[in-house]
Every structure is written in structure tokens, then in C-alpha cells.
Amino acid sequence: MSKQKIRIRLKAFDYKLIDQSAAEIVDTAKRTGAIVKGPVPLPTRMKRFDILRSPHVNKTSRDQLEIRTHQRLMDIVDPTDKTVDALMKLDLPAGVDVEIKLQ
């Protein structure tokens, strides 16, 4: 018999928010009797941009900006109905993107 598994992937620009959200999800799942594997930190993606400081001349003078996207991965093995209900009612911060897959 195959076990059901919920895979949760979190993405955010702020690592503090994503760690706080991951801790809330783990606490909620453990309270309802599910087994949690993770959170596993995935590689941080850095996107860099070069922007000209001057609108007219001085091509060599540029600003460098970057956006870092932090990611975490969690697996909830054998979730109960209580676990699914508790995860649906969970209120996470606005800056965290959550992807949930049933496997």
C-alpha cells in the first residue's frame, strides 16, 4: 500500500519570514500527528541587475541590484484529515509563496 504524502514548497525574498512560516507548518503538522520531513533549504536564487546611474552619459557608472529568492521544501508523510484541515486554516505572512502537491 502506497503512503500518501504532501509536499510543501515555500518561496520568499526574506529568509526570516520563510523560516517562521516553515516552523509554523512543522508545529501544526506535528500537533495533528503527522510525520514531517524537513524543512530542507534549497539553493538561494540570486538575480542581479545593472542599472545606469546617469540618464545621458557616464556609461561606466552603474548601480548593481540583486533579488534573492529563498526556498524551503517539506514533506508531510501520512497526513490525517486533521492535518489537512489545520494546514488549510493556517495563516501565513503575505510575503511567502506556498506550493502544495499531493503525491
UniProtKB/Swiss-Prot annotation:
Encoding gene, per UniProt annotation: rpsJ
Family matches, as NCBIfam families: PRK00596.1, rpsJ_bact
SUPFAM superfamilies for this protein: Ribosomal protein S10
Source organism phylogeny: Bacteria, Pseudomonadati, Pseudomonadota, Betaproteobacteria, Burkholderiales
Keyword annotations from UniProtKB, A to Z: Ribonucleoprotein, Ribosomal protein
Complex formation: Part of the 30S ribosomal subunit.
Record's function text: Involved in the binding of tRNA to the ribosomes.
One Gene Ontology term of the molecular function aspect: structural constituent of ribosome
GO cellular component annotations of the record: ribonucleoprotein complex; ribosome
Source organism superkingdom: Bacteria
Cleaved signal peptide residues: none
Protein known as: Small ribosomal subunit protein uS10
Cited PANTHER family: 30S RIBOSOMAL PROTEIN S10 FAMILY MEMBER
